[in-house]
Amino acid sequence: MDEQTFIMIKPDGVQRGLIGEIISRFEKKGFYLKGLKLVTVDRPFAEKHYADLSAKPFFSGLVDYIISGPVVAMIWEGKNVVTTGRKIIGATNPAQSEPGTIRGDFAIDIGRNVIHGSDAVESANKEIALWFPEGPANCQSSQHSWIYE
């Protein structure tokens, strides 16, 4: 099985109409969408998702931001999707993101940086289990043999 990652388009990305653009970038790279849902997150769920950041001074503002509007939660699958997905997304601080990355092209402030992506396989597995307790879709891309050796 290929690696999986969790990607979330944050409320600013949803409100700005960037869903299609973001999905397109992952699809064009050759990754396969295995789960997708548009959800409005409540405070306890957001706090659980960001529990590892609970001691940070920005935690409360981050939770307020995530619950401020709908988000798009996704599971993406492919070879090295966690590492490559982070490269597609760009640095957490948009000012340090290269042009051509999602944050480099669409974000200005670190507090409104459009997208979240798992930072490691372990956190991806944890986030996927939290957001998709039903698991990913049981399907395989027909393009798989055209992308991978």
UniProtKB/Swiss-Prot annotation:
Keyword Transferase attached: yes
Task: Please give the superkingdom of this protein's source.
Answer: Eukaryota
Q: Which UniProt keywords apply?
A: ATP-binding, Kinase, Magnesium, Metal-binding, Nucleotide metabolism, Nucleotide-binding, Phosphoprotein, Transferase
Does the entry annotate any disulfide bonds, and if so which pairs?
none
Which processes are annotated in GO (biological process)? CTP biosynthetic process; GTP biosynthetic process; UTP biosynthetic process
The catalysed reaction is: a 2'-deoxyribonucleoside 5'-diphosphate + ATP = a 2'-deoxyribonucleoside 5'-triphosphate + ADP; a ribonucleoside 5'-diphosphate + ATP = a ribonucleoside 5'-triphosphate + ADP
Coiled-coil region: none
Question: What is the active site of this protein?
Answer: 116
Checking Pfam families in the record gives: NDK (PF00334)
The GO terms this record gives for MF are: ATP binding; metal ion binding; nucleoside diphosphate kinase activity
Q: What is this protein called?
A: Nucleoside diphosphate kinase 1
- List the source organism: Glycine max (Soybean)
